[in-house]
Design a protein with these regions (language model features):
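Amphipathic terminal alpha-helices
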Residues: 2-3, 306-321
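N-terminal Rossmann NAD(P)H-binding glycine-rich loop of SDR-like oxidoreductase domains
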Residues: 4-22
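Rossmann-fold cofactor-recognition segment
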Residues: 43-54
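Catalytic helix-loop patch of NAD(P)-dependent Rossmann-fold dehydrogenases
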Residues: 85, 92-100, 115-118, 126-177, ...
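NAD(P)-dependent short-chain dehydrogenase/reductase
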Residues: 131-138, 162-221, 225-234, 252, ...
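C-terminal "lid/loop" region of Rossmann-like NAD(P)-dependent oxidoreductases
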Residues: 210-211, 215, 242-245, 254-260, ...
Length: 321
């Protein structure tokens, strides 16, 4: 049985992925520090423990003791806005935490001849930053896109990405870099899918139909976390060490489609009210990426956005009951 260790198991992706790995025959252990989801909802048979990735000594001890076959590194300060407020913390977690993990793997390989785990680090499309303005729907950015991050979070993820490449080139660590575009899951609440779904539940209970919105003209590709899980599994099976892979939905649509899908799921015809507070100072008209590289490994996207928002709406309907 292949042993997997997942950092950031208390996050949206991590909480889904530990269960997905178990269903696919892995022995799974996950760590968390400041969960952004309710970890009580995770399958209780999966071992979870608390670990701050900034605690390099504890990480060193854990990797050397457990010797996982594959490590999925999700743990991060993962929001751009807080990265402006506290760039020090963002760098300590995202950059320092990655260095600590890679150093732990390097030490374990030295102490245990023949031990050679895969390290799959989840970076972000935010590393492309300002370069994305040069692309169109007919010419989406692939993994050769320049790295021009526009905020401390993006810079920290670019550093994580490049550190993995450096440890691969210099020490032979089987590091794979994931450049993840927009992704959502049923238990994520701080994005348009979760926010709209939660408010739709609240409106349904009071007979309301006024939905406050921001910019709905922007085009996005929003991946279902269940499709992300299958992509990450394929990378353990077939991904090449040292390589970077974009992961993004191939379904690109304006944000008006979110409202249309929510109306289909809820049966509510929403009256849209523009709220200046929901508009971003800078909002990219298009945010999507080219995923031909991972598709060549056999990854197939299965879920439509309607499936995603229905699962999210039903989740918050139960959660807020």
């Amino acid at each position: 049985m292949r042993k997997a260790y997942v950092t950031g198991a208390g996050g949206v992706v991590g909480s889904h992925f530990v269960e997905y790995l178990k269903r696919n025959g892995y022995e799974v252990v996950g760590s968390y520090f400041t969960p952004t989801t309710d970890i009580a909802e995770i399958d209780p048979s999966i071992k979870l423990f608390e670990l701050d990735v900034r605690d390099h000594a504890k990480m060193m001890d854990w990797i050397g003791e457990y010797l996982p076959d594959v490590i999925y590194h999700f743990a991060a300060q993962s929001r751009p806005v807080p990265s402006w407020d506290d760039p020090y913390y963002t760098m300590e977690v995202n950059v320092g935490g990655t260095v600590g993990l890679l150093e732990a793997v390097k030490a374990a390989r030295a102490a245990h001849p023949g031990y050679d785990p895969k390290v799959i680090a989840i970076s972000s499309s935010a590393i492309y930053g300002d370069a994305l303005k040069n692309y169109t729907v007919d010419n989406l950015p692939d993994e050769t896109c320049p790295l021009l991050p526009l905020h401390p979070y993006g810079v920290s993820k670019a550093a994580e990405d490049l550190l993995c490449y450096q440890y691969y080139k210099n020490f032979g660590i089987q590091a794979i870099r994931i450049r993840l575009f927009n992704c959502t899951g049923k238990n994520k609440d701080q994005d348009i899918t979760g926010d709209f779904a939660k408010r739709a539940v609240e409106l349904s209970r009071i007979g309301g139909n006024v939905l406050r919105v921001g910019n709905l003209s922007a085009k996005r590709a929003i991946l279902d976390v269940r499709d992300l899980c299958s992509a990450l599994l394929i990378l353990d099976q077939k991904g090449a060490a040292g390589e970077a892979y974009n992961i993004c939905s191939s379904h690109i649509f304006p944000m008006t489609h979110v409202v249309e899908c929510l109306e289909q799921v809820t049966g509510i015809h929403f009256v849209l009210e523009r709220d200046p507070k929901l508009f971003r100072p800078a909002d990219e008209p298009l945010y999507a990426g080219n995923c031909d590289k991972i598709k060549a490994l056999g990854w197939v996207e299965k879920y439509q956005y309607t499936d995603t928002i229905e699962a999210t709406y039903q989740y918050w309907k139960r959660k807020l009951a």
